[in-house]
Amino acid sequence: AEIVVCDAAYAPRLFEVAGHLQGIRRLLVRGVVENGCPDVGFAIESLDDHRGHDTTPLAELPDPAALNALIYTSGTTGPSKGCMISGNQMCHVARLLLRAAPFGPNDVLWTPLPLFHMNAIATGVVSTLLVGGTISIAPRFSVSGFWPAVEASGATVVSILGALGTLLAQAPDNDAMRRCFGQIHTVKGNPFTEDIKAMWRTRFGARHIGSNAYGLTEALITSVPAGEPVPPGSSGRCAPEFDVRIFDDQDNPLPPGQAGEVVCRPLHPDIMFKGYWRRAEDTQKVMGNMWFHTGDIGKFDEAGFFYFVDRKKDYLRRRGENISSFEMESAILQHPDIEQVAVHAVRSNLGEDDLKVTAKRVAGAQLTEEALCRWMVDRVPYYAVPRYIEFRVELPVNPQGRVLKYQLRDEGVTPATWDIESSTIKVQR
């Protein structure tokens, strides 16, 4: 890369490794770097200096197949990897999401998501460019500041993560919210539960909530055209530009209704990532038998609708039963005192996984670990009742707000962890 775009919050870390970065000519910084910028051997410029536009035609049009950006994976199950993304893939993702949630030149899209994430770039910036609309990019997300920002920007479309949508739906009313009723017609992002979608419609007047799409940085695989009904819990149908299958551990295809690893391959050139930057071995691992192996567990129903089950590394096996951490987390988040949760494995002396729930309580909540466990006994299968529960002030997250489960797995049982075996709880089959 010759030009690097960096958020001011991460610039100091980049300065620390500047001596190892070869070929960089310019660093474009979004925001103000505290304590100034040191001499690092390349030009440092503010993105604000490049505001406006130049209507002069380009002397040379870019090759759609050429490398356009390095977008890093979320790093929730391990170290992040740089995905080599072409310009054509970037536009393909934007067009696919516009089919699911269209907007036009008179719309204003508001997003607080970081621009180093595929969501903000493709769903936000590129989609807006394709329709000729306007985008308002917030430096950060704030529940209390959301509606004032929507009012000030005139936003009619919002692109956020599902967890943020839940926080907003559960927040108290305010004057700006009342004034903006019906202003937002589309909320992009996932996952949104049916209850949260209903709250956005009734409280805020939004009409289209959630993206009904499934994909990774490497490839956007499913979506649903606007207006088509989707079964609850589904992420839509296979995108027509991809061949998507469900495989077992030996790469044999599985029939509808059976869960297995999601694999895909493109039916058109340059709509999927070109591999991981300088990680040929990792690229080879995920491209076994000429299929891209997503590392996700999913299934199709008889009608061709796709359902995400879990990350393969997060899929748990306990007492001979498979447990989806995704489904468990969705159930636990129904408790009014739980704000954030991660369900993950810890090592067991019995050879299988022991289940641990690491959670953050809502401010002021007095919920105990034992009380949460007793609440879960009545709501999850007996084999999914966790052995361990631990409350924390904060959970480790990446810049997109996703919990870094691999860190929690590595930490395992800590001195602050509650053990069901120390209680009087008896789980009945």
Regions found by a protein language model. Give the residues of each.
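AMP-binding/adenylate-forming catalytic core of the ANL superfamily
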Residues: 4-10, 158, 244, 250, ...
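AMP-binding/adenylate-forming catalytic domain of the ANL superfamily
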Residues: 30, 381-403, 421-429
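Conserved AMP-binding/adenylation subdomain of ANL enzymes
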Residues: 91-108, 116-157, 167, 171-172
